[in-house]
Amino acid sequence: MKPDAHHVKQFLLRLQDDICQTLSAVDGANFVEDSWRREAGGGGRSRVLRNGGIFEQAGVNFSHVHGDAMPASATAHRPELAGRSFEAMGVSLVVHPHNPYIPTSHANVRFFIAEKPGADPVWWFGGGFDLTPYYGFEEDAVHWHRTARDLCQPFGDDVYPRYKKWCDDYFFLKHRNEQRGIGGLFFDDLNTPDFDHCFAFMQAVGNGYTEAYLPIVERRKAMVWGERERNFQLYRRGRYVEFNLVWDRGTLFGLQTGGRTESILMSMPPLVRWEYDWQPEAGSPEAALSEFIQVRDWI
């Protein structure tokens, strides 16, 4: 089947609706929608839930941008895209909970297609999801990765280990020499064996996010926390900010190509703190995190 951008867009719009409805049902608060248009072509729907019962901030963004030509920064490494019209669409989300015992989660699924008359379209899918705990619980990590493995299984035995490794490699803070969290799945440039297969996998990843995350939220939401745990959560959120602003390709591409800044930075935590050369107390739960987020096989 030839690539069908309209079909992908309809799925992404439904996915945004489904995820927002699911998170609202768990939290009790509602998302506020901010629809926006891009002068050069396209637009999107940014939805944010603030100060809910469970989530301090959750942002779920849909965007669909298009144009007659790719920006030079995008074609420098992909000369085959020069002179083609393009469409790029996706859903991206980040959830920052109040409770430090609930991890932060991130997910993204996206589709890109570039076309010109008389030539085959250039297209691919990308996406994934990853988990950033502040306090490590092995059963949560096992559930997260088992859900990822199970959704990958119908697409081949090698899919989960390959995209798990890609996720571990991608969400790494080189300047800190540490992982951002415990990973999950990450894939990009997916266009084989055919459109239907790739689209089905992207849908499985998008639909699998809430199955992976919500049981962890339910398991941890009643745990009691205080100032110590909150301060550690805010400190570790600093790593999240550092990764997004220094290393994340999507954030950098969006800011460098005139994307909508409010939507791009929607992933940022609402509160964060840095402390010079802070070290956790030896033997404390906070000190245990650095070992917990080391790359390993969870299942």
Curated annotation (Swiss-Prot):
What cofactors are annotated for this protein? Answer: a divalent metal cation
Q: Where is this site: Important for dimerization?
A: 175
Localization per Swiss-Prot or TrEMBL: Cytoplasm
Q: Which domain of life is it from?
A: Bacteria
Sequence positions that bind substrate? 92, 108-110, 258-260
- UniProt binding sites for a divalent metal cation: 96, 106, 145, 175
An example GO BP is: protoporphyrinogen IX biosynthetic process
Q: Which residues form the active site?
A: 106
Q: Which segments carry the region annotation Important for dimerization?
A: 240-275
Q: What is its EC number?
A: 1.3.3.3
GO cellular component assignments: cytoplasm
Chief location of this protein within or outside the cell:
cytoplasm
Role of this protein: Involved in the heme biosynthesis. Catalyzes the aerobic oxidative decarboxylation of propionate groups of rings A and B of coproporphyrinogen-III to yield the vinyl groups in protoporphyrinogen-IX.
Q: How does it assemble?
A: Homodimer.
Stated name of the protein: Oxygen-dependent coproporphyrinogen-III oxidase
State the organism of origin. Salmonella newport (strain SL254)
Q: Which gene encodes it?
A: hemF
